[in-house]
Amino acid sequence: MKVTDVRLRKIQTDGRMKALVSITLDEAFVIHDLRVIEGNSGLFVAMPSKRTPDGEFRDIAHPINSDMRQEIQDAVMKVYDETDEVVPDKNATSEDSEEA
């Protein structure tokens, strides 16, 4: 399985989230709402998640092996590094990261 497309929108915010991302796998399956987060050790790609009733976050979709996780990380960060446009936080929603 290969990452065949990355749609990324950098956002301007005071928080740790730096971009919203959608990826396409094998030109056949899209995953929305990945995020680029600034962590203590640098930028990383966080999988889409939702908050449970007890306040914890659980991934909705995620790779099950380290090779796929690394491929997603590499593909997203390549596009992140190549993207100059940043939108204000008020415009950064999940809908903005969907394909037009």
UniProtKB/Swiss-Prot annotation:
SUPFAM superfamilies hit by this protein: SpoVG-like
Pfam families: SpoVG
Highest taxon in the source lineage: Bacteria
GO terms of biological process kind: division septum assembly; sporulation resulting in formation of a cellular spore
Keyword annotations from UniProtKB, A to Z: Cell cycle, Cell division, Septation
NCBIfam families the UniProt entry points to: PRK13259.1
Membership in a protein family: Belongs to the SpoVG family.
Note, other: Expressed more highly under biofilm conditions after 24 hours of growth.
Functional note: Could be involved in septation.
Protein's name according to its UniProt entry: Putative septation protein SpoVG
Species of provenance: Staphylococcus aureus (strain N315)
Source organism phylogeny: Bacteria, Bacillati, Bacillota, Bacilli, Bacillales
